[in-house]
């Protein structure tokens, strides 16, 4: 067969070592330590970092505060990520806010004077602040105390003002996404003291940000895990300036002519049907994308994305084929996404099934509120150009394992590659020094398969390609090498390891009747 890679003409004169991944090529069926993470979200004016530029890695939380602002979206992403991946190399690109954007706001109205002593509780983002209320405190005094408490905390992503017993809370960042910050804000009395505090409707910010320039900045480098703050609740497109365009960027960057191995991780705060609409959009139907869904959560979708990027890094940086099945908070596996305040917003069994069949990974919760994953999947679930479901590249480790396998093969090739090309030597003749041959290339690829399917694998001494003997033989049989006028073409069908996701036990009760 004539082997060609997408986007690279057969007569392209430039020297190269290129690769193309074609996923879902098998039979139909129903990081390394060098991997880094980039956060792509909003800063505040307090941060010194220029927008839409990629600077040095973030050194620590104080460096993050100085460069992006302590109340910023990036700062809260950084905190969420560091809970699970304290050693990861983390970059950030600040997305410029829309020039006409407005902040989100909400009011809290205090009704009357307190008839006794109590504590006013302020819950946000998994944190609780408390304000002492004394008997006789007027509505305005209570509102002022609440407002002062909010403004005194430098880590909250909003600030307040007060007038006539009404406190108005305004987000630090602008645009419609900032409404998530206020949706999760709860204020209430620990003990009823003859008054109330009423939360008004959240007025969502306006003027969505556009990721186009930030993506241009990211196009100058290669960072494995991307955790953007952009999110969606409906279908996306490849030119929408947000989720769909980000997916298209990752797709384009992975093309053979560019050759960057990257993945993008999004957070969704929406219903199951809304998540399906996002992930099954043609622009988002991508093996290199992951959508992690919560509903009415105390964390923003941006924080969920960052936390899940940390989880992926933690699991895959040593063993790229790691499973997320059953991932939960435990010794060595931090997982801190909070249980929704409204327990009806936990995903039901039916919703989990629907999510997993439509390219969405739901964040599940135990009856006691512990977060966990049923399994992790990519957003690819539809055969392109059709309405047919395709689950051959569903498991989340597939792009990670194939990227690691390619990196291993690439490193072996560049250390043994010779400057010249020739056909295979005659039977019995010794290979000639300084020449690559089709047979030599085939032996190299088969050797890589043997290593990556055995305990000799450099990835924690565990195979990242399927070690089943039949799978190994299929991979070896799939190797195709062709000699060209000035190079070699190679095709191989790698099969990543398969995870143990489903174990069924049938227990039969025996014994005599009595």
Give residue ranges: language-model regions.
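Polar low-complexity, Ser/Thr/Gly/Ala/Asp/Asn-rich disordered segments used for subunit assembly
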Residues: 1-35, 43-50, 55-299, 303, ...
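Structured, hydrophobic secondary-structure cores that serve as assembly/anchoring elements
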Residues: 1-89, 321-514
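Glycine-centered structural positions embedded in regular secondary structure
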Residues: 38-42, 104-106, 305-310, 314, ...
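Residue-level detector of buried hydrophobic side-chain packing
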Residues: 60, 146, 169, 298-330, ...
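Helix-centric, low-specificity signal for extended rod-like, repetitive segments
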Residues: 244, 281, 286, 305, ...
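A periodicity- and composition-biased signal for non-globular, repetitive helical segments
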Residues: 268, 299, 318, 398-400
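Intrinsically disordered, low-complexity regions enriched in serine, threonine, proline
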Residues: 285, 290, 309, 343, ...
């Amino acid at each position: 067969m004539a082997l060609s890679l997408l986007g690279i003409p057969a007569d392209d004169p430039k020297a190269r070592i290129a690769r193309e991944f074609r996923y879902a090529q098998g039979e139909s069926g129903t990081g390394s330590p060098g991997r880094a993470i980039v956060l792509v979200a909003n800063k505040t004016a307090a941060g010194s970092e220029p927008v839409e530029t990629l600077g040095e890695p973030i050194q620590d939380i104080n460096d993050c505060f100085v460069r992006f602002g302590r109340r910023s979206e990036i700062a809260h992403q950084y905190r969420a990520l560091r809970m699970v991946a304290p050693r990861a190399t983390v970059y950030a690109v600040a997305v410029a806010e829309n020039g006409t954007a407005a902040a989100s706001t909400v009011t809290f109205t205090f009704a009357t004077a307190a008839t006794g002593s109590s504590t006013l509780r302020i819950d946000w983002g998994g944190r609780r602040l408390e304000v002492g209320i004394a008997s006789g405190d007027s509505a305005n005094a209570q509102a002022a105390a609440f407002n002062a408490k909010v403004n005194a905390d430098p880590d909250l992503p909003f600030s307040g003002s007060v007038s006539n017993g009404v406190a108005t809370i305004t987000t630090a960042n602008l645009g419609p996404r900032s409404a998530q910050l206020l949706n999760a804000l709860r204020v209430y009395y620990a003990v009823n003291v003859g008054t109330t505090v009423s939360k008004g409707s959240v007025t969502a910010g306006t003027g969505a940000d556009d990721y186009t320039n930030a993506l241009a900045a990211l196009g100058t480098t290669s960072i494995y895990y991307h955790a953007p703050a952009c999110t969606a609740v409906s279908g996306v497109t490849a030119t929408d300036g947000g989720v769909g365009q980000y997916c298209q960027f990752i797709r384009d960057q992975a093309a053979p002519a560019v050759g960057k191995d990257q993945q993008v991780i999004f957070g969704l705060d929406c219903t199951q049907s809304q998540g399906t609409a996002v992930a099954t959009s043609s622009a988002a139907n991508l093996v290199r994308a992951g959508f992690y869904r919560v509903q009415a959560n105390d964390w923003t979708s941006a924080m969920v994305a960052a936390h899940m990027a940390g989880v992926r890094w933690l699991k895959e940086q040593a063993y790229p084929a790691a499973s997320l099945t059953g991932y939960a908070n435990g010794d060595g596996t931090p997982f801190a996404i909070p249980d929704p305040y409204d327990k009806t917003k936990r995903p039901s069994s039916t919703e989990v099934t629907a999510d997993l069949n439509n390219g969405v990974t739901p964040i599940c919760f135990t009856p006691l509120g512990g977060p966990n994953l049923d399994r992790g999947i990519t957003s690819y679930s539809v055969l392109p150009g059709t309405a047919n479901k395709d689950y051959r590249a569903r498991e989340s480790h597939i792009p990670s394992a194939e990227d690691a396998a390619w990196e291993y093969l690439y490193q072996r090739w560049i250390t043994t590659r010779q400057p010249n090309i020739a056909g295979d030597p005659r039977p019995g003749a010794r290979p000639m020094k300084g020449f690559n041959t089709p047979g030599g290339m085939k032996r190299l690829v088969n050797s890589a398969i043997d290593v990556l399917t055995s305990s000799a694998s450099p990835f924690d001494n565990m195979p990242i390609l399927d070690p089943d003997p039949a799978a190994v033989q299929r991979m070896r049989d799939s190797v195709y090498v062709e000699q060209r006028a000035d190079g070699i073409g190679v095709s191989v069908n790698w099969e990543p390891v398969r995870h143990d996701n489903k174990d069924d036990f049938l227990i039969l009760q025996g014994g005599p009747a009595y």
